[in-house]
């Protein structure tokens, strides 16, 4: 039996429309979907990737940013390995709101989670409202990793996940500890997307 690698749960958080789904889609399928459709509830996809000769099984949990779905979020944060907090660099308010998302993650997971702050939509050069320095400073303030991306342009998507797997490699404590946790995932109560549980494999060459 081949090396299945350790499993890690990545939960994507942030306001509606910041590009969480687009980042995941670009990583999963290498393309940008021009047809915007808001995530309903929670979406879940799985991808196996390799980093420095190690295999990582990533569960990507895409959460809805709408207020009416906020009550679903804490239960998905609770057993996460990584929280990816996304904002739109062309929306100052979405950046301001990342503080609340980070605080919610800390309330549920304390220090037992890797937080990554991601400024998406860097292709909107003329509409930028949040500088790189502001993003870096906030990440430093909250002890988070930081990266800017553009799912539309495919910019920094692979490097983002390479950074995440690199951080996971240095923090074994955040991986699932039980083998059954890798397969026994009950999605039925809160799963609404028809894309749920797609699985792919890739190599992360950084």
From Swiss-Prot:
InterPro entries xref list: P-loop_NTPase, Rab, Small_GTP-bd, Small_GTPase
S-geranylgeranyl cysteine-type lipidated residues: 204, 206
Subcellular localization(s) per the UniProt record: Golgi apparatus membrane
Keywords: ER-Golgi transport, Golgi apparatus, GTP-binding, Lipoprotein, Membrane, Methylation, Nucleotide-binding, Prenylation, Protein transport, Transport
SMART domains named among the record's database cross-references: RAB (SM00175), RAN (SM00176), RAS (SM00173), RHO (SM00174)
Sequence motif Effector region, residues: 36-44
Record-listed GTP binding positions: 14-21, 62-66, 120-123, 150-151
Topology of this chain in the membrane: Lipid-anchor
Highest rank taxon of the organism: Eukaryota
Gene Ontology BP term (one): protein transport
Coiled-coil annotated spans: none
Single annotated GO MF: GTPase activity
Major localisation: Golgi
Descriptive protein name: Ras-related protein RABH1a
GO CC field: Golgi membrane
Any Pfam family hit: Ras
Stated family: Belongs to the small GTPase superfamily. Rab family.
């Amino acid at each position: 039996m081949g090396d299945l690698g350790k499993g890690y749960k990545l939960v994507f958080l942030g306001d509606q429309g910041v590009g969480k789904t687009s980042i995941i889609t670009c990583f999963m399928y290498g393309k940008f979907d021009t047809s915007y459709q808001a995530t309903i509830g929670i979406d879940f996809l799985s991808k196996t990737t390799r980093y420095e000769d190690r295999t990582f099984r990533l569960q990507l949990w895409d959460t809805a940013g709408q207020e009416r779905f906020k009550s679903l979020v804490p239960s998905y944060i609770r057993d996460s390995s990584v929280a990816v907090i996304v904002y739109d660099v062309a929306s100052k308010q979405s950046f301001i709101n990342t503080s609340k998302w980070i605080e919610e993650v800390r309330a549920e997971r304390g220090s037992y989670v890797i937080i990554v702050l991601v400024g998406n939509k860097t292709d909107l050069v003329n509409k930028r409202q949040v500088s790189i320095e502001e993003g870096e400073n906030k990440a430093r303030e909250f002890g988070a990793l930081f990266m800017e991306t553009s799912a539309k342009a495919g910019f920094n998507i692979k490097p983002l996940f390479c950074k995440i797997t690199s951080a996971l490699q240095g923090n074994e404590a955040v991986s699932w500890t039980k083998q059954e946790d890798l397969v026994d995932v009950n999605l039925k109560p809160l799963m609404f997307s028809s894309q749920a549980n797609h699985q792919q494999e890739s190599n992360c060459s950084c």
